[in-house]
Amino acid sequence: MDNIDEDLTPEQIAVLQKAFNSFDHQKTGSIPTEMVADILRLMGQPFDRQILDELIDEVDEDKSGRLEFEEFVQLAAKFIVEEDDEAMQKELREAFRLYDKQGNGYIPTSCLKEILKELDDQLTEQELDIMIEEIDSDGSGTVDFDEFMEMMTGE
């Protein structure tokens, strides 16, 4: 079983542990798979029922109809991490909008250079130029949102 716990913060794992424990009424160390939807709902995590069922099937390796805590974390992480990606994209869009003062859908590379310098004041002028060259892949002298996202997320 590939362990994706490292995608979660200790706080998120603690919240999952509490939720898991409160549904593990017999304290057997496992919960019925049909309770997963209730737990996600209580945690305010949006999910698609069909995707959830497919993931339960994938994660419940022994097909017992019950999930041990580690299986539950593996499953819940898929929903929690996805939500974080959406939140991060929204934050990056807001940050981009702040620098795109004219609302043209792009920012000048000179502006991006200032941002990078603020993020890491150890960068030399040459390193900054190399980074800008990589980010502004089409050589337009501007960076659009997709190029900005790619730079910030590495995706």
Curated annotation (Swiss-Prot):
Residues 11-46, 47-82, 87-122, 123-155 form the EF-hand domain. Ca(2+) 2 binds at residues 136, 138, 140, 142, 147. This is Troponin C, isoform 2. Coiled coil: none annotated. Belongs to the troponin C family. One of its GO terms (cellular component) is cytoplasm. InterPro entries: CALM/Myosin/TropC-like, EF-hand-dom_pair, EF_Hand_1_Ca_BS, EF_hand_dom. One of its GO terms (molecular function) is calcium ion binding. Accumulates almost exclusively in larval muscles. Keywords: Calcium, Metal-binding, Muscle protein, Repeat. Ca(2+) 1 binds at residues 60, 62, 64, 66, 71. It comes from the Eukaryota. Pfam families: EF-hand_7 (PF13499). The gene is TpnC47D. It comes from Drosophila melanogaster.
